[in-house]
Amino acid sequence: MSEEKQTAEQVEAAEQEEVTEQAEQAASQEQHEETAGQEEALQHQIDELQGLLDEKENKLLRVQADFENYKRRSRLEMEAAQKYRSQNVVTEILPALDNFERALQVEAESEQTKSLLQGMEMVRRQLMDALEKEGVEAIEAVGQEFDPNLHQAVMQVEDENFGSNIVIEELQKGYKLKDRVIRPSMVKVNQ
């Protein structure tokens, strides 16, 4: 019996050992599953945070691009304002310049009138020099092809001496300030 008892004890010890191993394996598996669950939760949290980070980076890039565009637009507007700062003054002076040119077309009959016209021509020349320093230039019209960006056609005639769509006569001078037309030339155009 002692052998039976010993065998029974061995069987019981083996069973006890097996139960302990199974319990340890179950605990280990639970711990592994718990760790895997935590890893999965952490990975999910990392993915969410990465998505938020990407979204914020995109917003930042858009804001930076918008700001750069704003700076560029502002700079261009400032340059244009500086470039064309004298446009209002020039526009106001042009009618006086037109009157000078009309007055200079009068034929002088006396020495006194000739002297007066010479003085007026000098004043007109000084005005033109000052305007040219600001970037004002007269638009060439007579003999040029009609350009609606530079010329305003007020009359059309048929003249065999000129080609089609050629400016025959300038009725009022046009002017440009740098590259901007501030007053188109009023012209007579051949059909």
Curated annotation (Swiss-Prot):
Belongs to the GrpE family. Keywords: Chaperone, Cytoplasm, Stress response. NCBIfam families: PRK14140.1. This is Protein GrpE. Participates actively in the response to hyperosmotic and heat shock by preventing the aggregation of stress-denatured proteins, in association with DnaK and GrpE. It is the nucleotide exchange factor for DnaK and may function as a thermosensor. Unfolded proteins bind initially to DnaJ; upon interaction with the DnaJ-bound protein, DnaK hydrolyzes its bound ATP, resulting in the formation of a stable complex. GrpE releases ADP from DnaK; ATP binding to DnaK triggers the release of the substrate protein, thus completing the reaction cycle. One of its GO terms (biological process) is protein folding. CDD domains: GrpE. PANTHER family: GRPE PROTEIN, GRPE PROTEIN HOMOLOG, MITOCHONDRIAL. GO terms for cellular component: cytoplasm. Pfam families: GrpE. InterPro entries: GrpE (IPR000740), GrpE_coiled_coil (IPR013805), GrpE_head (IPR009012). GO terms for molecular function: adenyl-nucleotide exchange factor activity; protein homodimerization activity; protein-folding chaperone binding; unfolded protein binding.
